[in-house]
A protein has these predicted regions:
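A short, conserved alpha-helix in the catalytic core of glycosyltransferases
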Residues: 178-229
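A recurrent flexible, glycine/aromatic-enriched loop bordering the glycosyltransferase active site
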Residues: 154-160, 166-187, 209
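Short, acidic, metal-binding catalytic loop of nucleotide-sugar glycosyltransferases
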Residues: 22-33
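Non-catalytic, C-terminal membrane-associated alpha-helical segments of glycosyltransferases
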Residues: 244-254, 258-303
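A conserved acidic beta->alpha catalytic loop
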Residues: 23, 39-49, 66
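Conserved donor NDP-sugar-binding/catalytic core segment of glycosyltransferases
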Residues: 97-143, 150-154
């Protein structure tokens, strides 16, 4: 029997969190035992759950009086459970729905030699596609949000393979990747013990790209497994294209690049950052300023 700890962060989005948990109760768990932790990450919407409704997934709700971000929230859950006996730690976004065999398939792939992390094929939730009007009705729910990921080192960006494409079998081969999204990421406990979980300086965005690079540098492989399927609402708690995006993506791209990019790209990032200080949007400028001031974590952002 293999044991999995599932870590879910809740932030002002009760409907999504409840739907996510309901999907977990339908998982095929033969040979698996799961324990699920929902961390209320400083939210104000009064998450109320009937724990007895989720006995199959052994649910525990934790309260965090402040919003510690994606990084701090998952780190808090891991700190809570690190002394327990378990094999795998699953990071799961609360605006996600797991297909019933998803977790079983992911864990089976962990038996492959050298694999330290596995991610599934992820679709946009039906009706939540970026450009839903351009698809046929029968294509909705089959549009990729993520079909594996990679780091574009020429631009220092973490990229989703296949995003906005309809699934026509073009990404049906499992493969090794160098960027695993934190939306649904299964990790071996031994990996976290060796490299730790998230660098809390990121707060949110680029934290999963940073974790991926540390996994690879520790000698482990990251596997994309297309037979495992998940649906994701996309930016359910942050909102795509927002000032929040401007701030954290700008600041954290600098942090990620200075940690992991080549010397040539580091020099390019410095030049680009100087330009952004004069031509960027308000929160892009603030993100650059805070990077140089080493103001990380939640930083200066205020909605």
């Amino acid at each position: 029997m293999q044991k999995i700890i599932i870590s879910i962060l809740h932030y002002n989005n009760s409907k999504d969190t409840i739907n996510c948990l309901k999907s977990l109760t339908g998982l095929v768990l033969s040979g698996l035992e799961i324990e699920t932790f929902v961390l209320d990450n400083g939210s104000k919407d009064g998450l109320t759950l009937n724990i007895s409704d989720f006995s199959k997934i052994n649910l525990t709700v934790l309260k965090n009086p402040k919003n510690s971000g994606f990084t701090g929230g998952h780190n808090l859950v891991y700190e809570k459970v690190q002394d327990k006996e378990f094999d795998f730690f699953l990071l799961l976004n609360n605006d996600s729905i797991m297909e019933s065999h998803c977790l079983k398939i992911l864990t089976e792939k962990m038996d492959t030699n050298g694999i330290g992390a596995v991610v599934p094929k992820i679709y946009f939730t039906k009706g939540m596609e970026f450009h839903k009007n351009k698809y046929e009705k029968n294509e909705l729910g089959k549009v990729f949000w993520y079909a594996g990921g990679y780091v574009d080192w020429n631009n220092v960006q973490s990229k989703h393979r296949g995003v906005d494409e309809v699934d026509k079998g073009q990404y049906d081969e499992e493969c090794e990747i160098d960027f695993a999204t934190g939306a649904c990421l299964l990790l071996k406990k031994e990996v976290i013990r060796q490299i730790k979980l998230f660098d809390e300086r990121y707060f949110l965005y680029f934290e999963d790209a940073d974790l991926s690079q540390r996994i690879l540098k520790a000698g482990y492989k990251i596997l994309f497994e297309p037979k495992a399927i998940l649906w994701h609402n996309n930016a359910g708690s942050s909102g795509s294209g927002s000032s929040l995006h401007d701030y954290y993506l700008t600041r954290n791209r600098m942090l990620f690049g200075m940690k992991h990019a080549s010397l040539k790209m580091k020099a390019h990032l410095v030049r680009e950052s100087i330009k952004l200080l004069t031509t960027g949007r308000q929160w892009q400028k603030k993100g650059i300023q805070d990077f140089y001031l080493q103001k990380f974590g939640a930083g200066s952002f205020r909605p």
